[in-house]
A protein has these predicted regions:
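N-terminal membrane-targeting/pre-transmembrane regions
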Residues: 1-42
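Phosphoinositide-dependent membrane-docking surfaces
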Residues: 15, 110-111, 122-137
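Alpha-helical transmembrane spans
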Residues: 30-95
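Conserved beta-hairpin
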Residues: 77-123
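Hydrophobic/aromatic beta-strand elements that line small-molecule binding cavities or substrate pockets
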Residues: 102-103, 127-130, 154
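Generic beta-strand structural signal
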Residues: 104-107, 134, 143
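A membrane-cytosol interface segment of integral membrane proteins
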Residues: 137-178
Length: 178
């Protein structure tokens, strides 16, 4: 039985796993930041094989250096990113039972209330919301291209599919993925 909700309230309690999953999604799936390191790696590997085909005196050394740099730098890039995400998650002190923010979804827009510190609530109309994604049991609500709020499953006062339907109905199919 489906209900037509006029307001849905999501009291968000984030854990480290959800935060890290979002960071990986944002970096690699949404912003596609894996393409340049992969392209760099591919180019250097091709040059390494070309150097080996030259059969000159130092071509083996040049090929080895190109392979080490071509594989090593992208690995360092990804490793540094994952390390920074781990440090951010630890610094944020995310505990599954602590509310981080509350997001009432209303017909006129979204209101974000910070539950960790005293600050003015943020009001965002549906027209100005950039995009919404539904991935891995969580809705990523991007209020701008660089700022998202996470709405994990089973934390709203409505079933998860109703929350997603509510958002899709107000944003439109073009702004919703998942």
């Amino acid at each position: 039985m489906d209900f037509d909700y006029s307001d849905i309230v999501v009291t968000v309690k984030l854990d480290e796993k959800t935060f890290k999953r979002f960071a990986r999604f944002d970096m690699f799936s949404r912003r596609k930041k894996w393409i340049r390191p992969a392209l760099f790696s591919l180019i250097l590997i091709v040059f390494a094989f070309i150097a080996l085909l030259a059969r000159k005196e130092q071509s083996g050394v040049i090929a080895a250096v190109l392979l080490v740099v071509g594989i090593g730098l992208p690995l360092v890039y990804v490793g540094t990113f994952l390390s920074q995400v781990n440090m951010q998650a630890a610094r944020a002190n995310l505990k599954p039972d602590q509310p981080v923010y509350t997001v009432p979804l209303r017909d006129e827009g979204v209101r974000i209330v910070n539950d960790r510190k005293e600050e003015e609530p943020q009001e965002v109309s549906w027209d100005s919301i950039h995009r919404a994604y539904r991935k891995n049991g969580c809705i990523y609500l991007y209020v701008t291209p660089s700022k998202a709020f996470l709405l994990p499953s089973k934390q709203a006062d409505a079933p998860d599919h109703e929350v997603w339907d509510f958002i899709r109905k107000r944003l439109g199919e073009g702004k919703c993925k998942g």
